[in-house]
Each structure stands twice: as C-alpha cells, then as structure tokens.
Curated annotation (Swiss-Prot):
Presence of keyword Lyase: yes
Entry's EC annotation: 4.1.3.39
This protein's name: 4-hydroxy-2-oxovalerate aldolase
CDD domains in UniProt: DRE_TIM_HOA
UniProt lineage: Bacteria, Bacillati, Chloroflexota, Chloroflexia, Chloroflexales
Family: Belongs to the 4-hydroxy-2-oxovalerate aldolase family.
Species, as recorded: Chloroflexus aggregans (strain MD-66 / DSM 9485)
Length: 343
C-alpha cells in the first residue's frame, strides 16, 4: 500500500444529512480546519452536485457558488472541488463554479452510463480543471463491466476514476476486486468512495488501498448520506498507524470533527435499521421513504420491497418501480394465503 490522496467531502456528501443548509460561516470554519490539517482536496457543492438545489433534490440555504467562493478564500493549500452529475449540472454551472474558485470537478454517472459524460469532461479540460470520474452504484456491476465504463471516462480526459459504493453495499472483497480491475486496465489513477451502511466504510477503504487505490474519500464525523461515509479523522488515524499518513494532522482532524462539525449536525449518521436495509438491498437511500409509503399502502414490509428492488437492480429515476414491486409482493402474498386456505 502507498499513502493515498484524501478528498474530504463533508461539504458535499455531508450536505444530504444537513438538508443542504450549510452557511458561509460553517463552510469557512470547516475549510479552514481541513486546510490547516493538511487535507489536499475539499469538495463543496449541493449534495446532488452543481445545480442540485431544486424542488426535486432539496433547496440550498445558501447558493453553492457562494459556498465555493467562501471555501476558496479560506483554503491556503487545499484544492476546492465540486461534484457534477450530467443531467443536473450544465455548462453554465460548471463555468460559474470555475469563476468562483473550483480547481477540481468530479463528474458522476451511473456505473453503466459513462458515455453521457463525454461533453462534461471535454468542457472541464477546456476550463483547465483536474477531472475525476465517479462510477456510482458500482456494486451493481462486475469488475470487467466497470473497466469498460472506466476506460470511457479515461478516454474523455479523466485524471482519475473512482469506484463509488453509493449504497454502502460492498464487502471488502467487492471493493478490492473492482479497484484492482481498474488499476490493471487504466493508465490514470483510481479512487474509492465508501459509505457506511453495512459498517464497512473504513474496512472497504482499506481493502481498496490494498488493491492499489490512489485516492480515497472521507467526511468529518462520517457526515454523509445514508449511514455516512468513512470518517476523515478515522481514516487519518488508521493511515497514520499503517505508516501511510500523507501529511494529515490526526489531532487537528479529530478536533475539527468534535468541535466544529458535531455541534452543527442534525443527527449522527450510523447504520440504523433503515441504513442497513439500504446497504443490504443495494439500493439508493432515496427509495426508502417511497418504499415505506408503498409498504403501508399495500401491507408489505418496506424492507421486502427494497430487497426486491435491489434484486431487479433499480437505479435512481426508477422510483415508479416501487409501486409495481409492492403490488407484485402483495399479489404473491395473497396467492400464498389462498393456497394455504385451500390446503
């Protein structure tokens, strides 16, 4: 293993549990602490990326461009990054983000849809940005299929391609196999982004590092979607124990998590019943509320609905499947009850 580059995404992935309510003052304090602690890249944007502030994804308290501008003004050494999802963010938002101070853009697609990112990588390169590709929900496809998608991003200009465990569904061998496959096939760097739904955020990140990952992600206090991400301060401590500290101030990150982030958190993300179900089923956390409503309507345990959605490999945008699945399960249960009655 080698010392990785760490990107802290408290101010992006952490925007989900914060309901996108970060303020300039909060961003200033967090960026200043991360920068002083030696974190080389800090991601700042709406949880769903540039232009995510909307009725569908949740409105931001403060414009993400204002937050980016604040972050850049307080970062003396760290680079400022933003997330961009094709279909949400456009050329206009990317250009504005550059004008406000981002130096890195992370372009995210479903792990089967890298081909929709070509224009986004092209523009990012024209604008002089470092570019990172995100293959989301990467647990859903085998390593060889992910290699094909990663090669597309590499050909479009990605400087690094990430395996992203969006649902927190991977086990350590899953993370290692996917990272190893990309390392063997690509000439650019490979990264890994963990979620903690099965309690494996740190473990999966270590497995990815053992497989050769060059870049990893974390959030202070684990503040991220679902059960949260690998905690930045924990990653720093573990890397230091392994002799792989890339220049991080372990105590400084512990203090930032404890005294700056913890007091503003609406709750502590952890693997509760709902989060575990998301990781176990391997589906997006956005399905959870819809599954609960459908379960109540049709008398089905929402966990059964989510597991079936995972079996069918439903992805974001296919929320309409939830009612169909609930109906199917209800009919099967009804048929089973009738058989018992006639038996």
């Amino acid at each position: 293993m080698k010392a990785p580059r760490l990107t802290d995404t408290t101010l992006r992935d952490g925007s989900h549990p914060m309901r996108h309510q970060f303020t300039r003052e909060q961003v200033a304090k967090i960026v200043q602490a991360l920068d002083r602690a030696g974190v080389p890249v800090i991601e700042v944007s709406h949880g769903d990326g540039l232009a995510g502030s909307s009725l569908q994804y949740g409105f931001s308290h403060t414009s993400e461009f204002d937050l980016i501008e604040t972050a850049r003004s307080y970062a003396e050494r760290a680079k400022i990054a933003a997330l961009m999802l094709p279909g949400i963010g456009t050329r206009q938002e990317l250009k504005e983000a550059v004008a406000r101070g981002i130096q890195v853009v992370r372009i995210a697609t479903q792990c089967t849809e890298a081909d929709i990112s070509e224009q986004h990588f092209g523009l990012a390169k024209e604008l002089g940005l470092e570019t990172v590709g995100f293959l989301m929900m990467a647990h859903m496809r085998p390593p060889e299929a992910l290699v094909e998608q990663a090669k597309l991003m590499e050909s479009y200009g990605a400087d690094c391609v990430y395996i992203v465990d969006s649902a927190g569904a991977m086990l350590p061998h899953d993370a290692a196999a996917r990272v190893r496959a990309l390392k063997e096939a690509l000439s650019v760097q490979v990264g890994f982004h963990a979620h903690n739904n099965l309690g494996l955020g740190i473990g999966n990140t270590l497995a990815a590092l053992e497989a050769g990952a060059d870049q990893i992600d974390g959030c202070l206090r684990g503040l991220g979607a679902g059960a949260g991400n690998a905690a930045t301060e924990l990653l720093a401590a573990v890397l230091d124990r392994l002799g792989l500290n890339p220049g991080l101030d372990v105590f400084g990150l512990m203090d930032a998590a404890e005294y700056i982030v913890a007091p503003i958190m609406p709750f502590q993300p952890f693997p509760d019943r709902d989060a575990i179900t998301i990781g176990y089923a391997g589906v997006y956390s956005t399905f959870l509320l819809h599954a609960k409503r459908a379960g109540e309507q049709y008398g089905i345990d929402p966990r059964e609905i989510l597991v079936e959605l995972g079996r069918r490999q439903a992805v974001a945008g296919q929320e309409d499947w939830i009612i169909d699945v609930a109906l199917d399960l209800s009919r099967r249960r009804g048929a089973g009850t009738r058989k018992e009655a006639h038996g």
